[in-house]
Amino acid sequence: MKKLVVLGGGESGVGTAILGKQKGFRVFVSDKGNIVEKYKKVLLNNEIEFEENQHTENTILDADLVMKSPGIPEKVAIIQLLKNKSIPVISEIEFAAYYTDATIIGITGSNGKTTTTLLVHHILKKANLSIGVAGNIGDSFAQQVAEKSYENYVLELSSFQLDGIDKFNSNIAILTNITPDHLDRYDYDFNTYV
């Protein structure tokens, strides 16, 4: 059985853990901070092993695959250790996309993502399409793939969520705009952000 380590015990992490367990992975969730009580309950109810307030390196470096929550920068030590060991580190969006054949509309940009995502979702729902909304809003994409069977998804995708994308491609992509936001995460280089 392959081991999936999930770094981050929030919305993206817990959703990925649920989907990973459903797909036959041995799942371990690690969060450097506290895991919110509602997420702890979900992990306990699904019998998913977890730790909080630390990252146990030996346990994490034993992974076959790692999902990094969007709030964790690429530069942190544990991510660098994983990359040095050639352990794949992907995003929740990438992981969830492996397990759905749904049509995906991806919406990104510096401003207007949420409004555009909700508008597109509303229009398509009114057109009676089987449509879920996820990404940076609502339930995680991974959790929805695990628990629901939508034929289409509208995903709000922040730049942080797009870090760790390898093969993910939405069927339709919308870029609202690009302005110099979050440059601290991208070494203050606008081209890296873009």
What are these regions (language model features)?
Residues 21-22, 58-61, 70-194:
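Phosphate-binding loop of NTP-binding sites
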Residues 1-91, 95:
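N-terminal leader/targeting and accessory segments in enzymes
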